[in-house]
């Protein structure tokens, strides 16, 4: 047999895929990520418990020793790896964006494509490889996600900076994330994400494909500090940072280390995902000189900001304001800045050769902090008050590295700061006895006789709970923030009806609490969810079934003062397919937005399907729309949605130019039977969703439908109950 003839069949991944044939196919696979099948630790492994057994002081001691243990295969700049680990931690956390809560350092995703091969992450593969002996030593007591952030903290501390604290609890993923939209560009560093007057596409935060933030040379490489400031402000705002936090982060981070642009980037080899097997997961092998140390090429910029690049100081601002700056180019040809007239000669040490000295250098984006009027005021204040910079940087760094973790209740370890911060969406701790089963039954009876409809009870509970985002663990029913601004004004929450429902439920709450003599109380947050559970039980009873929906008390009510209105505005749904709601018309289809919301709610495709079917017959659409209410007995928890959707006696036809509304008519008589949206009809159109709908439309499905709906409903109601985990 010829050596060129393989006797085996093609590998499973070879050949043309369904997506090659049908590029617009609904991406349901994003609902089935993080499967136990890909996790080598098994479903029984509890990372939080494992982390609690970690000797944090010991691992920090090992990390501190690593900082100055320079390795020949990748020597430390200035004899200290601290700046490299700061960059690694920063770039791990810095992909977070507020628009959908995705990105960030909470999963260790920097280990996988595309992030492990982004142009902005050049040579961070070396940082993670330097950490491997420590990860190997402590095993599963610390995740890669936690270790990368902790290494950044220890790096700062080892260089004389006092950090604000550290919270562990970031569990690793084991495969690349498929749900994150990084942009539509097909080429690294393209910026097709802009339209109009440099309007950045939502939910993106970075200015170019493959960058964490902004182009350090300026917009599209144009070295204009004032124009760059506009990009900086937009990008950092989309990461939940205000101007003061932005200035502190840039100045604080650039107090340490250097950038690398010793030679032409053409000397740099392929990124890790494209490198050969012999590279063993490393990438960017450079043929320029030794390819490392003083010959390293990373960004193409060759900048060292301060005279003490491995010690905390105020020298960044001293240099920024102490010199006038002129444009030059790095050895790699990138735009950067040096003091005019040769000032500052020999001020800056060389990273590897003690006999060499350099002038201070700055990036275009560094000069933005001086030449943008708003940034300049903050920068000058920090320049004149170094203690304010230290405090602001400590707090901003903590926010950067913890913003995607959700409430403070999820933080683990002895270094969690005691101070409660507004961006952590604080909720008061339980300070009273909780209601028992007898109380729950009595409260449900009160709610059911209060005059509220099933639809009102269910839709209000759903509105409260479904703000949850599994991406950054924000939102949810705990806190009862649905009664506060901005949620009580959102169109999707039907403010007028919401106010009436809340008034009724507050009456039930007040009556119960005033009747207690032992300090027992029920929160409005619990009452809202309990009302939804009562509504589901009532709807099942209407359909001839007796069920009990699980309910766990223990939620508390947040105050308006504990609620950052601007921070919560990003949680407003532009679409909620579960309530058949679209705020406007978008380039993305309603069914894609449904899948996206289901993914944020951590739902599987079967859970999404059964919830849609149940919510429709419960009459929970926004505005009481009849679209998708495929039943003659609304507010009865039946499988009618599926039965009638799959009925071949109905012929469907679009009734709008955009094909977002449809009517279903009797195949024989032509009489109008139903109306529906794309979200409704996709469960009969998409082959995968139709297969699920068929399960619930079958004649033996009612019991399964009830059980599965209640399970999925309970899951959503408890998504933010980290105390129950």
Swiss-Prot record:
Catalytic activity annotation: H2O2 + AH2 = A + 2 H2O; 2 H2O2 = O2 + 2 H2O
Site description Transition state stabilizer, residues in chain: 87
Cofactor binding note of this UniProt entry: Binds 1 heme b (iron(II)-protoporphyrin IX) group per dimer.
Keyword terms, alphabetized: Heme, Hydrogen peroxide, Iron, Metal-binding, Oxidoreductase, Peroxidase
Location of cross-link Tryptophyl-tyrosyl-methioninium (Trp-Tyr) (with M-239): 90-213
Crosslink position(s): Tryptophyl-tyrosyl-methioninium (Tyr-Met) (with W-90): 213-239
Name under which the protein is recorded: Catalase-peroxidase
Gene designation per UniProt: katG
């Amino acid at each position: 047999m010829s050596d060129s003839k393989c006797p085996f069949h093609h590998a499973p991944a070879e050949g043309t895929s369904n997506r090659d044939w049908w590029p617009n196919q609904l991406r349901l696979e994003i609902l089935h990520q993080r499967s136990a099948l890909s996790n080598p630790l098994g479903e029984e492994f509890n990372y939080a418990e494992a982390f609690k057994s970690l000797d944090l002081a010991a691992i920090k001691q090992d990390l501190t020793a690593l900082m100055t243990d320079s390795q020949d295969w990748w020597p430390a700049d200035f004899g200290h790896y601290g700046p490299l680990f700061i960059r690694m931690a920063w770039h791990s956390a810095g992909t977070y964006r507020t628009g959908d809560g995705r990105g960030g350092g909470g999963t260790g995703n920097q280990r996988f494509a595309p992030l492990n091969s982004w142009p902005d992450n050049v040579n961070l593969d070396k940082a993670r490889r330097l950490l491997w002996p420590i990860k190997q030593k402590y095993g599963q007591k610390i995740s890669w996600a936690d270790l990368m952030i902790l290494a950044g903290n220890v790096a700062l501390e080892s260089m004389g900076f006092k950090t604000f604290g550290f919270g562990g609890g970031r569990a690793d993923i084991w495969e690349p994330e498929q749900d994150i939209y990084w942009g539509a560009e097909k080429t690294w560093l393209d910026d097709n994400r802009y339209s109009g007057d440099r309007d950045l596409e939502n939910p993106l935060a970075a200015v170019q494909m493959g960058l964490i933030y902004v182009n350090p040379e300026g917009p599209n490489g144009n070295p204009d500090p004032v124009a760059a400031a506009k990009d900086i402000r937009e990008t950092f705002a989309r990461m939940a940072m205000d101007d003061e936090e932005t200035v502190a982060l840039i100045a604080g981070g650039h107090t340490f280390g250097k950038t690398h642009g010793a030679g032409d980037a053409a000397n740099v080899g392929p990124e890790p995902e494209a490198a050969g097997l012999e590279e063993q997961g490393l990438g960017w092998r450079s043929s320029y000189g030794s390819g490392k140390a003083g010959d390293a090429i990373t960004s193409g910029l060759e900048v060292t900001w301060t005279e003490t690049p491995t010690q905390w100081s105020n020298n960044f601002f001293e240099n920024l304001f102490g010199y006038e700056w002129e444009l030059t180019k790095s050895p790699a040809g990138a735009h950067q800045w040096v003091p005019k007239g040769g000032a500052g000669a020999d001020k800056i040490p060389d990273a590897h050769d003690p006999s060499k000295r350099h002038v201070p250098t700055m990036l275009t984006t560094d000069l933005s902090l001086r030449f943008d009027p708003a940034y300049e005021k903050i920068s000058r204040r920090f320049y004149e008050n170094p203690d304010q910079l230290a405090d602001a940087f400590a707090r901003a760094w903590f926010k950067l590295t913890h913003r995607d973790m959700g409430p403070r209740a999820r933080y683990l370890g002895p270094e969690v700061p005691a101070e409660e911060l507004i961006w952590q969406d604080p909720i008061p701790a339980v300070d009273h006895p909780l209601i028992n089963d007898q109380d729950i039954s009595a409260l449900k009876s009160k709610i059911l006789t209060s005059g509220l409809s099933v639809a009102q009870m269910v839709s209000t509970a759903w509105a409260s709970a479904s703000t949850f985002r599994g991406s950054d663990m924000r939102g949810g029913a705990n806190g009862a923030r649905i009664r506060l601004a901005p949620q009580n004004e959102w169109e999707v929450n039907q403010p007028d009806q919401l106010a009436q429902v809340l008034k009724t439920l507050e009456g039930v709450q007040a009556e119960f609490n005033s009747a207690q003599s032992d300090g027992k109380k029920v929160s409005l947050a619990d009452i809202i969810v309990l009302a939804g559970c009562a509504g589901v039980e009532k709807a099942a009873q209407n359909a001839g079934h007796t069920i009990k929906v699980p309910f766990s008390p223990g939620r508390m009510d947040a105050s308006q003062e504990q609620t950052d209105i601007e921070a919560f505005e990003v949680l407003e749904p532009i679409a909620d397919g579960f309530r058949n709601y679209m705020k406007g018309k978008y380039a993305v289809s309603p069914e894609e937005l449904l899948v996206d919301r289901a993914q944020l709610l951590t739902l599987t495709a079967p859970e999404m399907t059964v919830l849609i079917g149940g919510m429709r017959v419960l009459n929970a659409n926004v505005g009481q729309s009849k679209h998708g209410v495929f039943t003659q007995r609304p507010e009865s928890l039946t499988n009618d949605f599926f039965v009638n959707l799959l009925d071949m006696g109905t012929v469907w036809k679009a009734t709008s130019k955009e094909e977002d509304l449809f009517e279903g008519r009797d195949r024989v008589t032509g009489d109008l039977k139903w109306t529906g949206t794309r979200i409704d009809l996709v469960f009969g159109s998409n082959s995968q969703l139709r297969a699920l709908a068929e399960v619930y439309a079958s004649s033996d499905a009612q019991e399964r439908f009830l059980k599965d709906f209640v399970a999925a409903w309970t899951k959503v109601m408890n998504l933010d109950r980290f105390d129950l985990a």
